[in-house]
């Protein structure tokens, strides 16, 4: 509760009380889907957890949602209803290779935000935006079930042939099915999961899809990350009917996340100094740095494994990383 309250009280977040554009004093607002989508979700949580702040929090969430809607591609466009990955020229948004581009799966973050706001307010506007995003994903999916990792924000043309890791979209479709009874998008999950298992997992090429790291010229295995491996393991372990193949794939992905990115301890250097505080989880090959979100990814995967298998070691590892 204190974490969401802390975020709520940040000056750049408080700015949403009176405006419908982001306060760029917090320069990560340059990533609308990811950060402003998360802001909306945070404020809905604040409204639920702190009733005295509910009116203020929902006003902030609605203003942030207005910004995402205003920035979204229009109906009929190749990326209809998608808000952008990048805004203005802060941080990585200023890079030439990001100008006018968008990460294909980041609209899922905005979709979840719209659904959270709809759930709280009942305002059909937000539900319709979330469904519009899902409809666009239905149109964009390739015959083999895959999606390009990054595309032109106006034309929808891929920047290259690197494919996206699909756990964000699979979880989005799962929410639409389970919470709202929508089966229209089940084919996205069926085809997408098949591609993930037969291509990405089979090749063990769980590539990173970070908005601040270029995918131009990206070779297989060049930028592996727990941020795709561990969440997809969790997706498999949370299926209603888990097959033996699902379980084995999940275990392998967790092993990848532990072996390549998790430090249970650090050998001190000649001066007795440890490079990192351990245990920790580094994010990706191209950003070899401990990140809390990565620790969360791997911890949740271990916890999901424990809940399926009862393995006490998996539970111990999950607890250690938190």
Residue ranges and their predicted role:
Residues 1-322:
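Glycan-recognition and catalytic cores of secretory/periplasmic carbohydrate-active enzymes
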């Amino acid at each position: 509760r204190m974490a969401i309250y802390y975020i709520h009280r940040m000056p750049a977040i408080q700015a949403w009380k009176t405006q419908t554009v982001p306060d760029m004093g917090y320069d990560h607002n340059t990533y609308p889907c990811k950060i402003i989508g998360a802001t909306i979700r945070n404020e809905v949580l604040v409204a639920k957890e702190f009733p005295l702040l509910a009116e203020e929090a929902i006003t902030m969430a609605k203003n942030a949602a207005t910004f995402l809607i205003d920035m979204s591609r229009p109906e009929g466009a190749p990326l209809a209803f998608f808000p952008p990955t990048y805004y203005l020229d802060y941080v990585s948004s200023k890079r030439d290779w990001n100008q006018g581009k968008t990460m294909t799966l980041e609209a899922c973050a905005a979709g979840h935000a719209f659904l959270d706001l709809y759930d709280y307010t009942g305002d059909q506007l937000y539900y319709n935006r979330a469904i519009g995003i899902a409809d666009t994903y239905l149109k964009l999916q390739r015959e083999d079930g895959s999606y390009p990792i990054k595309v032109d924000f106006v034309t929808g043309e891929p920047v290259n042939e690197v494919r996206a890791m699909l756990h964000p979209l699979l979880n989005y479709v799962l929410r639409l099915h389970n919470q709202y009874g929508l089966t229209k998008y089940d084919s996205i999950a069926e085809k997408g999961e098949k591609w993930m298992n037969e291509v990405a997992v089979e090749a063990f090429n769980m590539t990173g899809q970070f908005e601040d790291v270029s995918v131009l010229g990206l070779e297989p295995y060049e930028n592996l990350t727990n941020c795709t491996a561990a969440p997809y393991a969790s997706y498999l372990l949370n299926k209603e009917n888990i097959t033996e193949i699902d379980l084995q794939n999940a275990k392998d992905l967790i092993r990848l996340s532990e072996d390549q990115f998790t430090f249970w301890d650090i050998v001190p250097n000649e001066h007795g100094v440890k490079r990192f505080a351990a245990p920790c989880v580094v994010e990706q090959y191209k950003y070899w740095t401990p990140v809390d979100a990565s620790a969360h990814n791997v911890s949740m995967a271990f916890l999901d494994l424990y809940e399926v298998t009862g393995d006490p070691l998996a539970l111990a590892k999950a607890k250690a990383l938190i």
